[in-house]
């Protein structure tokens, strides 16, 4: 049977073997809220992995808006209705919509854990309602320091100590450095799930050419 005669469901099974499809069919077939969230996180991970390939490009311009706009642009190229700095209870960093479904992401460069907490609180108490059409959100954490695993573990411990109602966390099966947290949303009174996603942008090469470049920079 030729590819022209395959149904969307049949094509979806072939996505992993046909790079040109690039998850396109899964996005079309995502009818439920849970399907929308699952496919979105898969696509965000793909974008993150691509961004992590060249951390050296971000060392001189460490700006949250630039990093987040690039993610938004990639989501748009994938066909998502994505926007940056959208007015939803405030100026949300990243908003993705599909029909009545809304996913909101808050982005922070890791400076300290209180700074991440403020971003979490913006997502939790300012931007999201926690209603059934937006019961999930995300925290994008741009990490320029070393040892992302340690940063994420300490962030989870910090969050656990904040006495959120019915707080719980669990590790992400699809990405070991990410984790999910759940708690009772202040506004809706329902369970709100946040995916905490690190973006590894640490860059400190220690090969000979890198050391020479550092010496030359000091001399200059």
Predicted regions and their residues:
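Catalytic cores of nucleic-acid endonucleases
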Residues: 109-163
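Short strand-connecting beta-turns/loops that link adjacent beta-strands
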Residues: 99-100, 132
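Domain-level recognition of nuclease-like catalytic cores that cleave nucleotide substrates
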Residues: 142-220
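Localized chelating/binding microdomains
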Residues: 38-46, 50, 60, 64-68, ...
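Short, mixed charged/polar active-site loops
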Residues: 91, 102, 191-193
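Active-site metal-binding core of divalent-cation-utilizing nuclease and nuclease-like domains
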Residues: 69-99
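Conserved catalytic cores of phosphodiester-cleaving nucleases, focusing on short active-site segments
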Residues: 94-96, 102-109
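Interdomain/boundary linker segments immediately adjacent to catalytic/signaling cores
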Residues: 1-65
């Amino acid at each position: 049977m030729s590819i022209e005669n395959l149904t969307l469901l049949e094509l979806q099974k072939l996505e992993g073997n046909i790079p040109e499809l690039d998850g396109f069919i899964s996005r079309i077939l995502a009818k439920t809220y849970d399907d929308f969230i699952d496919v979105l996180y898969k696509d965000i991970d793909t974008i993150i992995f691509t961004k992590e390939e060249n951390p050296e490009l971000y060392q001189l311009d460490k700006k949250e808006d630039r990093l987040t706009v690039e993610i938004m642009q990639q989501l748009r190229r994938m066909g998502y209705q994505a926007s940056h700095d959208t007015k939803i209870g405030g100026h949300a960093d990243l908003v993705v919509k599909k029909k009545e479904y809304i996913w909101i992401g808050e982005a922070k460069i890791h400076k300290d854990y209180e700074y991440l907490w403020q971003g979490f609180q913006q997502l939790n108490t300012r931007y999201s309602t926690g209603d059934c059409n937006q019961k999930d959100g995300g925290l994008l954490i741009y990490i320029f320091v070393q040892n992302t695993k340690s940063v994420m573990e300490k962030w989870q411990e910090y969050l656990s100590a904040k006495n959120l109602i019915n707080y719980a966390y669990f590790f992400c099966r699809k990405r070991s450095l990410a984790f999910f947290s759940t708690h009772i949303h202040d506004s809706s009174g329902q369970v709100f799930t946040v995916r905490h996603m690190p973006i590894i942008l640490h860059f400190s090469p220690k090969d000979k050419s890198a050391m020479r470049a550092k010496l030359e920079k000091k001399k200059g």
